[in-house]
């Protein structure tokens, strides 16, 4: 039962960006700039929080170093979103919503190699999905500024994905 619950939480976390986009596609509408800002901000806050958790709960120094990079990058990205949103007359969420807090909860119970493995696999899946969403927004966003932001953020997301994939190939310690 515990494994099933963990798998459900893992899949939910990994598929969040795609689900946000699919919800709008199902309604026949593209993701609005506000929807994209909300999704990006929630993801930034969640990844920064998970990265902070890794400082205490991960066992691998490589995972801790990677997680700190994500904390730094996603914190800076969140601040950039605030500037972008203010310029566009949009709002940025200031705290994690209930869905994102629920996605973080399973990580609170993990330590050591179990945390490392789950964290790395989650980052691979999450960044793969995020790259898809950001790529779409880089051409479909209503605002030229949002398009430019999505385009400019793609290399960082790719760096995060590449880093997580490299970690997944290292033997667990």
Model-derived regions: residue spans:
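His/Met- and acidic-residue-enriched segments that coordinate or traffic transition-metal cofactors
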Residues: 2-10, 15-173
């Amino acid at each position: 039962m515990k494994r099933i619950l963990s798998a459900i939480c893992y899949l939910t976390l990994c598929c969040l960006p795609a689900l946000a986009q699919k919800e709008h596609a199902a309604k026949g509408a593209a993701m609005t700039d506000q929807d994209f800002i909300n999704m990006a901000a929630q993801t930034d806050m969640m990844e920064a929080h998970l990265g902070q958790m890794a400082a205490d709960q991960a066992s691998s120094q490589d995972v801790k170093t990677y997680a700190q990079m994500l904390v730094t990058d996603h914190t800076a990205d969140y601040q950039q979103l605030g500037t972008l949103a203010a310029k566009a007359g949009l709002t940025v969420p200031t705290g994690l919503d209930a869905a994102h807090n629920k996605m973080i909860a399973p990580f609170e119970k993990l330590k050591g190699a179990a945390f490392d493995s789950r964290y790395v696999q989650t980052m691979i899946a999450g960044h793969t999905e995020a790259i898809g969403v950001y790529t779409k927004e880089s051409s479909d966003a209503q605002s030229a500024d949002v398009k430019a932001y999505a385009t400019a953020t793609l290399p960082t997301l790719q760096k995060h994905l590449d880093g997580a994939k490299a970690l997944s190939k290292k033997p667990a310690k």
